[in-house]
Amino acid sequence: MEDYTKIEKIGEGTYGVVYKGRHKTTGQVVAMKKIRLESEEEGVPSTAIREISLLKELHHPNIVCLQDVLMQDARLYLIFEFLSMDLKKYLDTIPSGQYLDRSRVKSYLYQILQGIVFCHSRRVLHRDLKPQNLLIDDKGVIKLADFGLARAFGIPVRVYTHEVVTLWYRSPEVLLGSALYSTPVDIWSIGTIFAELATKKPLFHGDSEIDQLFRIFRALGTPNNDVWPDVESLQDYKNTFPKWKPGSLGTHVQNLDEDGLDLLSKMLIYDPAKRISGKMALNHPYFDDLDKSTLPANLIKKF
């Protein structure tokens, strides 16, 4: 830690306080995440250290780079590249009645998918994607932050400040207590973020797990074994759930064209096995008119 100076506290993440800091010799500005662990006495679990070390290998222009992992007084600090704005804050700055430019929505979604495909191809899930951990710069680049931390530290039910961790972007298989889940959980989250990019409003903003499920069911219909094999045997599925009929996504998300709504509907398919993959999503006709040559991941490929 002696290599870094804390400049100021910039926020409170899922796992602890985040500081803006500076490397004493290089002058590079960084984000320093102090990880607060449930069992303070026992120190940092070796599994967490192992998981985190793997994340240092994830180098991609749309992933926030983990530069260093440091220990001080049995506290773990993760040193990340610094970006000053997250997507939630950015959407909040857009004046009422105005929306994100359609080409920006498309570019952001494409870059988010490029980042997720990179991680999924390396068997790393995010599991907790939301606008707060999508960071942006002033050049139109968007990066995914906090990758893999859910696996290393678990997703707490409450942030250590006792604020409830948001359920708005969580997939139905996780909400219904499925023990076996995989890459489709991230695709669902990206689908809900896609809708929010277009409308500035969360698509499903439940205030409890059951409210979250019912908001999804009201929009997409209550799932059953016909549309999602074995859903009725998931731990938290109840036969007493109200049986809502599927509605039209277009009524909830009005700023998307036909291709956009088609892609969104494929990202929000109940059955994880049928949900579109990140790789397939990148090839969807929605992106046909996007100039991909200027995107950061594509610029690197040229060299």
From Swiss-Prot:
The keyword Cytoplasm applies. Residues 4-287 form the Protein kinase domain. InterPro entries: CDK, Kinase-like_dom_sf, Prot_kinase_dom, Protein_kinase_ATP_BS, Ser/Thr_kinase_AS. The modification Phosphoserine is found at residue 277. Its main location: nucleus. GO terms for molecular function: ATP binding; cyclin-dependent protein serine/threonine kinase activity; protein serine kinase activity; protein serine/threonine kinase activity; RNA polymerase II CTD heptapeptide repeat kinase activity. Its EC number is 2.7.11.22, 2.7.11.23. The active site is at 128 (proton acceptor). It is found in: Nucleus; Cytoplasm, Cytoskeleton, Microtubule organizing center, Centrosome. GO terms for cellular component: centrosome; cytoplasm; nucleoplasm; nucleus. Gene3D superfamilies: Phosphorylase Kinase, domain 1, Transferase(Phosphotransferase) domain 1. The modification Phosphothreonine is found at residues 14, 161. Phosphorylation at Tyr-15 by WEE1 and WEE2 inhibits the protein kinase activity and acts negative regulator of entry into mitosis (G2 to M transition). (Microbial infection) Phosphorylated at Tyr-15 by Rous sarcoma virus v-oncogene Src, possibly causing mitotic slippage. Thr-14 and Tyr-15 are phosphorylated maximally during G2 phase, but dephosphorylated abruptly at the G2/M transition. Phosphorylation at Thr-14 and Tyr-15 inactivates the enzyme. During M phase it is also phosphorylated on Thr-161. Finally during G1 phase it is phosphorylated on Ser-277. Plays a key role in the control of the eukaryotic cell cycle by modulating the centrosome cycle as well as mitotic onset; promotes G2-M transition via association with multiple interphase cyclins. During G2 and early mitosis, CDC25A/B/C-mediated dephosphorylation activates CDK1/cyclin complexes which phosphorylate several substrates that trigger at least centrosome separation, Golgi dynamics, nuclear envelope breakdown and chromosome condensation. Belongs to the protein kinase superfamily. CMGC Ser/Thr protein kinase family. CDC2/CDKX subfamily. Forms a stable but non-covalent complex with a regulatory subunit and with a cyclin. Interacts with catalytically active CCNB1 and RALBP1 during mitosis to form an endocytotic complex during interphase. PANTHER family: CELL DIVISION PROTEIN KINASE, CYCLIN-DEPENDENT KINASE 1. This is Cyclin-dependent kinase 1. The gene is CDK1.
